[in-house]
């Protein structure tokens, strides 16, 4: 009788065993009978009159309280339905704790390889991890985080329903739009241009996403030194971590066949600030370059030749932006520490990508190949035409490919020809049908209010032919390797977390880069992702349960929490007994 679990007709779960927790929830979403004060009631095991039998359950069923019960509001909402589905999914995968039936096991499922292969490779088809995934293993409760990782689709849907998550995304987007308005302008132009010309942009989604990220990163980092306001946002970066020893890879080989044991770690940097190294004032147009009639290549050559001087007076600060629901920084130190580590990874990646331009070139190509992309395949001509029409620096730069000229990047120039062709001749037809003039977005000068200019397709007629050097991802990897070499050499050892409440940057934390701390964290995170250790739940103290578990989706079904809370109650009773006995002596 003591090991049985009884459920009344209303779905309320009753455990007729010692220390029944009367404010818990079972895995299937039903509730254990709650009390007013959330106390744990001791059912004395040596007194059978204290054990509920079938007659007792029947009396409980007929209490007036149950006549007015109804499903909780949570289960009547989309969020509640997703939560129930997620809990069921996690329970099915992890199984019940055999020592504590009805509660989820807190060890990795047997029969599976490890979280990296289970989640990233097999479930999501992504042969990579993210900086966020490495940093969130220990920022709160590792147990909760891996329950979420294994139910990623449902967890993400739940997150997207939360107001604060949506608010945070909007703040990030508004900051990006303020610094880089050309992105929305480009999207608007492209939409109208395709509709008017009846052109289609048939391009693989993964290729399109990577191409946009690479193009925008080059453009934004170049602008950091030219007409920019000293800021760049949403910049991609990556590095590698060894699958066997969990160490961050400091030196890359040029061939992917020699780096199979290295897993890509990708990230997106929220904010880069170019500032004077001595007075910390933000630098605008630090390179003093006139971009008219210039190209990406010319600007990069100039920056490379003046890098020593730039480095003596300037530095770039990496920041991570965190949004808050109240104007206060987190009270949990592990959350702040996780944010610090996130920026340390970015600093490490930029340092790694600034060692050698040839290695960095191959590193970006390995990144693309691991995503299943063909780095030798010509890029969709319509996509390139929209870049040419909206970005003069790019248009002037790719003339080198059009005419088969070198771009002054030795690895690319020796590697670029290939057997594929890149042909834009079909666009000659546009000159004989439909409109040929369009308003395109331009970068605004301080003394000009014009945001667009009129361009004619006829002015770009020289591009509408077969190019002598195909335009592939290799070209973008080459330009990325140059600008990342420049930026990486300027990255400061001072890192920053920016806290925002609504659109107000109410607090910043500046801290130093710590190589040893980063290496230790990377190894520990890698061990759990690659199967070297099990999950580490939070330390079982009542304070931790009150702090970490209060809003956790798994708080009613977590065996770790349930078992240890019972132990704490037992301990409390024992201490009370000892104190009582001591006082009676």
Curated annotation (Swiss-Prot):
- What keywords are assigned to this protein? 4Fe-4S, DNA-binding, Exonuclease, Hydrolase, Iron, Iron-sulfur, Magnesium, Metal-binding, Mitochondrion, Nuclease, Transit peptide
Provide the cofactor list for this protein.
Mg(2+); [4Fe-4S] cluster
Question: Which GO cellular component term is one of those annotated?
Answer: mitochondrion
Give GO terms: molecular function aspect only. Answer: 4 iron, 4 sulfur cluster binding; DNA binding; metal ion binding; single-stranded DNA 5'-3' DNA exonuclease activity
Where in or outside the cell it occurs: the entry states:
Mitochondrion
Which EC numbers characterise this protein's activity in its record? 3.1.-.-
- Give the enzyme's main class according to its UniProt record, as a single word: hydrolase
Transit peptide located at 1-26
GO biological process terms on file: interstrand cross-link repair; mitochondrial genome maintenance
What Pfam families does this protein map onto?
Exo5
The free-text cofactor remark is: Binds 1 [4Fe-4S] cluster.
InterPro entries on file: Exo5, EXOV
Q: Disulfide bonds, which pairs?
A: none
Residues annotated as binding [4Fe-4S] cluster are 141, 549, 552, 558
The primary location reported for this protein is: mitochondrion
Q: Entry's PANTHER family?
A: EXONUCLEASE V
The family line of this record is:
Belongs to the EXO5 family.
Quaternary structure and partners: Monomer.
What this protein is reported to do is described as: Single strand DNA specific 5' exonuclease involved in mitochondrial DNA replication and recombination. Releases dinucleotides as main products of catalysis. Has the capacity to slide across 5'double-stranded DNA or 5'RNA sequences and resumes cutting two nucleotides downstream of the double-stranded-to-single-stranded junction or RNA-to-DNA junction, respectively.
Name used for this protein in its record: Exonuclease V, mitochondrial
Q: Top-down, what is the taxonomic lineage of the species of origin? A: Eukaryota, Fungi, Dikarya, Ascomycota, Saccharomycotina
Gene encoding the protein: EXO5
């Amino acid at each position: 009788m003591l090991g049985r679990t009884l459920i009344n007709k209303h779905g309320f779960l009753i455990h007729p065993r010692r220390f029944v927790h009367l404010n818990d929830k079972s895995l299937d979403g039903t509730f254990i009978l709650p009390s007013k004060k959330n106390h744990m009631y001791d059912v004395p095991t040596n007194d059978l009159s204290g054990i509920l039998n079938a007659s007792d359950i029947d009396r409980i069923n007929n209490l007036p309280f149950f006549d007015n019960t109804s499903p909780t509001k949570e289960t009547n909402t989309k969020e509640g339905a997703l939560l129930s589905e997620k809990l069921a999914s996690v329970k099915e995968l992890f199984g019940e704790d055999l020592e504590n039936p009805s509660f989820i096991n807190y060890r990795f499922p047997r029969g599976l390889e490890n979280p990296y292969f289970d989640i990233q490779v097999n479930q999501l088809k992504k042969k990579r991890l993210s900086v966020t995934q490495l940093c969130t293993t220990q920022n709160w409760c590792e147990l909760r985080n891996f329950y979420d990782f294994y139910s990623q689709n449902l967890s993400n849907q739940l997150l997207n329903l939360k107001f604060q998550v949506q608010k945070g995304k909007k703040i990030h987007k508004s900051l990006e739009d303020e610094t880089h308005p050309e992105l929305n302008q480009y999207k608007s132009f492209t939409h109208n241009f395709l509709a008017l010309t009846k052109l289609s942009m048939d391009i693989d989604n993964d290729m399109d996403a990577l191409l946009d990220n690479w193009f925008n990163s080059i453009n934004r980092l170049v602008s950091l030194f030219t007409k920019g306001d000293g800021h760049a946002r949403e910049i991609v970066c990556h590095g590698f971590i060894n699958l066997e020893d969990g160490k961050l890879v400091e030196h890359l080989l040029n061939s992917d066949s020699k780096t199979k044991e290295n897993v890509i770690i990708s990230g997106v940097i929220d904010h880069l600030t170019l500032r004077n190294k001595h007075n910390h004032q933000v630098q605008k147009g630090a390179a003093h370059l006139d971009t008219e009639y210039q190209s990406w290549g010319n600007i990069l050559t100039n920056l490379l030749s003046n890098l020593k001087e730039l480095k003596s007076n300037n530095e770039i600060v990496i920041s991570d932006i965190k949004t808050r629901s109240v104007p206060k920084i987190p009270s949990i130190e592990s959350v702040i520490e996780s944010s610090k580590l996130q920026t340390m990874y970015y600093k490490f990646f930029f340092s790694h990508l600034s060692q050698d331009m040839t290695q960095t070139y191959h590193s970006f190509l390995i990144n693309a190949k691991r995503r299943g992309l063909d780095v030798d395949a010509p890029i969709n001509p319509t996509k390139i035409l929209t870049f040419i029409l909206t970005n003069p620096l790019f248009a002037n730069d790719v003339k080198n490919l059009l005419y088969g000229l070198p771009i002054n990047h030795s690895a690319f120039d020796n590697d670029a020809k290939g057997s594929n062709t890149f042909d834009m001749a079909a666009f000659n037809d546009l000159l004989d049908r439909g409109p040929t003039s369009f308003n395109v977005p331009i970068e605004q000068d301080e003394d000009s209010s014009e945001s667009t200019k009129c361009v004619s397709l006829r002015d770009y007629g020289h591009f509408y032919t077969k190019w002598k050097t195909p335009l592939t991802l290799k070209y973008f990897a080459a330009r990325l390797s140059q600008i990342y070499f420049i930026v990486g050499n300027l990255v400061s050892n001072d890192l920053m977390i920016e806290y925002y409440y609504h659109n107000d940057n109410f607090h910043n934390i500046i801290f130093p880069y710590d190589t040893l701390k980063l290496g230790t964290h990377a190894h520990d995170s890698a061990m759990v992702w690659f199967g070297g250790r099990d999950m580490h739940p939070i330390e079982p103290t009542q304070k931790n349960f009150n702090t970490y578990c209060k809003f956790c989706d798994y708080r009613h079904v977590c065996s770790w929490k349930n078992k240890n809370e019972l132990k704490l109650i037992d301990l409390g009773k024992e201490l009370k007994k000892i104190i009582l006995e001591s006082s009676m002596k």
